[in-house]
A protein has these predicted regions:
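Functional-site microenvironments in short loops/helix caps that host divalent-cation chemistry
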Residues: 82-209, 219
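Extended beta-strand/loop cores of jelly-roll/beta-sandwich
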Residues: 1-100, 107-110, 210-239
Length: 239
């Protein structure tokens, strides 16, 4: 049953309509004919012995042996390019989400403008009254150097742990598809906006940025992975 959540508006967390036995691992949601990560991706680094440890979400993973995981309650990876996002998804047997399946997952079973409905609700997602790290750290300067400052997303009231905005979900059970970090898709765009902007390039699930090359990254760019049902097994544990 759907559950109410206290906050600045009468949020209702949608009931997840699809569960175990749908061909997707527990960390992914079944969305039509795709499996979609429930949470924005974080990374684990793999050493020469095969041991895995968390990779810093505040640094670019360029050249590191990493793979993508979908976990609740962790800071999602930022500072990642489309090129590196693809590599991280592939290392986990997944792929970077295709633009149409990403958009379908964001809109939910009811095909709404935002994950939670057709009307914007301030504070439902991580996109309201957040702090600009460029203003805090660099007097508003936006350059390749300042926008990849590892301290950017460590400032208060910036990037939030995955799943912390309880209302930013839908009946598929995917979280944070609007706000928090931009999410790269395989057409070279990133979608959904980030914690400072979810409207400049489209509202909510329609948000789409196409201005950057696949090798581009900054403090706002993240991703999530997708897969075909049955390709990974349903007992994959990413906890």
């Amino acid at each position: 049953m759907s559950s109410p959540v206290a906050g600045p508006a009468a949020y209702i967390i949608p009931e997840v309509k699809l569960g175990p036995g749908n061909g997707c691992p527990n960390s992914m949601a079944r969305v039509d004919s795709s499996c979609v990560d429930k949470y924005e991706a974080s990374l684990v680094q793999i050493d020469e012995t095969g041991k895995e440890s968390p990779f810093s979400p505040y640094e670019a993973p360029n050249g590191h042996n990493v793979r993508a995981v979908s976990r609740e309650g962790v800071v999602p990876q930022a500072h990642i390019s489309m090129v590196e996002a693809k590599r991280a998804c592939n290392a986990s047997g997944k792929r970077l989400c295709r633009a149409p399946e990403w958009k379908t997952a964001c809109k939910g079973p009811e095909a709404t403008r935002y994950p939670y409905g057709d009307n914007r609700v301030p504070g439902a997602c991580v996109d309201t009254n957040r702090t600009s790290p460029m203003a805090t750290l660099h007097q508003g300067e936006h350059s390749a150097q300042t926008m990849n400052d590892p301290l950017a997303n460590q400032q208060e009231n910036t990037l939030a742990p995955t799943g912390s905005a309880a209302a930013c979900t839908n009946g598929y059970g995917v979280h944070d598809m609007v706000g928090n970090v931009h999410e790269w898709t395989d057409d070279g765009s990133f979608r959904g906006g980030y914690y400072l902007d979810t409207s400049e390039n489209g509202e909510g699930c329609e948000y789409r940025t196409t201005a950057h090359a696949p090798a581009y990254y900054d403090y706002s760019t993240g991703f999530r992975c997708c897969a075909d049902p049955g390709s990974l097994g349903e007992d994959v544990d990413e906890s």
